[in-house]
């Protein structure tokens, strides 16, 4: 079996590809099937979030596998009003929802309860099968993400 052990900082030309949803792209140790049908094992550093376009390599540097972000069931919010998008981000962030933020658009894993909440704010929410690339903080390990150290002047409960 092919073992992919590193993400290349400077991507090389891919010799293969693998299409993965976000819940697999956050795992450091997992068995995957490449798009050409071969089995491969991911043996990556913990806390590494794979993004579409990343290139992984084996230890020998003889195989280069490009990561493709799989289409997933996502709720899509499109809005030209930055205030309304900020309001949506605030409420979704308060619920620790993994969120992809782009100019004029938000995506999160489809959830009809969250969809209804945002519709109550007057936002239009649609469903799509699209790649999902959430902000890293939602998935990063403690050394890479949002810390919850509390200081005398700042506190919040979870």
From Swiss-Prot:
The gene is ureE. Involved in urease metallocenter assembly. Binds nickel. Probably functions as a nickel donor during metallocenter assembly. NCBIfam families: PRK13261.1-1. Belongs to the UreE family. One of its GO terms (biological process) is protein-containing complex assembly. One of its GO terms (cellular component) is cytoplasm. Disulfide bonds: none annotated. This is Urease accessory protein UreE. It is found in: Cytoplasm. GO terms for molecular function: nickel cation binding; unfolded protein binding. InterPro entries: UreE (IPR012406), UreE_C_dom (IPR007864), UreE_N (IPR004029), UreE_N_sf (IPR036118).
């Amino acid at each position: 079996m092919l073992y992919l052990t590193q993400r290349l900082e400077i991507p090389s030309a891919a010799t293969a590809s693998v299409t993965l949803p976000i819940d697999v792209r956050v795992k450091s140790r997992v068995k995957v099937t490449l798009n050409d049908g071969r089995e491969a094992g991911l043996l990556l550093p913990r806390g590494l979030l794979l993004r579409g376009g990343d290139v992984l390599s084996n230890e020998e540097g003889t195989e280069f596998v490009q990561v493709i972000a799989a289409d997933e069931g996502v709720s899509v919010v499109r809005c030209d009003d930055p205030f309304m998008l900020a309001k949506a981000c605030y409420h979704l962030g308060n619920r620790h929802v993994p969120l992809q933020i782009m100019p004029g658009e938000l995506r999160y894993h489809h959830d009809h309860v969250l969809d209804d909440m945002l519709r109550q704010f007057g936002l239009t929410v649609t469903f799509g099968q699209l790649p999902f690339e959430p902000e890293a903080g939602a998935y990063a390990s403690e050394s890479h993400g949002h810390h919850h150290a509390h200081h005398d002047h700042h506190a919040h409960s979870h």
